[in-house]
Amino acid sequence: MSASTTATLRHDWTLAEVRALFVQPFNDLLFQAQTLHRAHFDANRVQVSTLLSIKTGACPEDCKYCPQSGHYNTGLEKEKLLEVQKVLEEAARAKSIGSTRFCMGAAWKHPSAKDMPYVLEMVKGVKAMGLETCMTLGRLDQEQTEALATAGLDYYNHNLDTSPEFYGSIITTRTYGERLQTLAYVRDAGMKICSGGILGMGESLDDRAGLLIQLANLPEHPESVPINMLVKVAGTPLENAEDVDPFDFIRMLAVARILMPQSHVRLSAGREAMNEQMQALAFFAGANSIFYGDKLLTTANPQADKDMLLFSRLGIKPEAGEGHADEVHQAAIEQALVEQQSSAMFYDAASA
């Protein structure tokens, strides 16, 4: 194994170094990323999560990409916090189809005191099923963070979204510093961090590099790094944003893998718009986590049967979690193959 694959994790990346990674020949970049990936992970295993929106719409934040913002008319109806029992039913369903982590998202600036007891019950209930737990609830204070940790929350998601320099062009209702403070509270409470960003909002190459530098130069790398491709929603200020070049998106995944070689890099929002070939390249570039199921908060996500068939064709299996994930995964593949016999369920990659 070369020195480059065994080096100590770095937290001092510079813009010049990261820019140089982005602009090198595509095949060289992917080779470097795949080499590092294999040094730290089983290259044919992907972590599988399911995401549930536990409170949808009317968020007071003004994130220009988000259909849940109350500042924009996107046709999304406001919903109350889901009942704990409903959340637990969805978690059980997620486990039955092979997910090992259950993520719960609420459209809040920050959780209120009246909602916290219900949120904590959700964490305890999902944890009792043998699933890893993750939540994204907005900004947290120290007391809330410690309460979530005590309840057994494994991961807290709080994305940085983009570089500090470009951030003010996308969001004005929450500062970059507040996001970093929440991440610090999460780390101090002993939970794992899930934090990443979005491509396709009009950011520059240096902004993409800057986002990854912020994440990689944290005192500890996030355990999970979701890389999202903008899902353009009518009514949001970014509904007419330019499409992200597929190769540029793959480059982002590869550079994330190189900077944070021991983190799970998640192929997150926007996967519905990716054909099978692009997803396969994403896995080769070092992506080793996906959201699995029908919806990603409020936007479409590739159907579970399509995911299982693609995994089968690529020789990929989900990372083992509690509950015999391999057996569940194999059963899902067999069921998907049966359903594929119906033309209505057949997935034609050429037209995707």
UniProtKB/Swiss-Prot annotation:
Residues 44-262 form the Radical SAM core domain. [2Fe-2S] cluster binds at residues 103, 134, 194, 266. [4Fe-4S] cluster binds at residues 59, 63, 66. Pathway: Cofactor biosynthesis; biotin biosynthesis; biotin from 7,8-diaminononanoate: step 2/2. The keyword NADP does not apply. It comes from the Bacteria. NCBIfam families: bioB. Belongs to the radical SAM superfamily. Biotin synthase family. Homodimer. This is Biotin synthase.
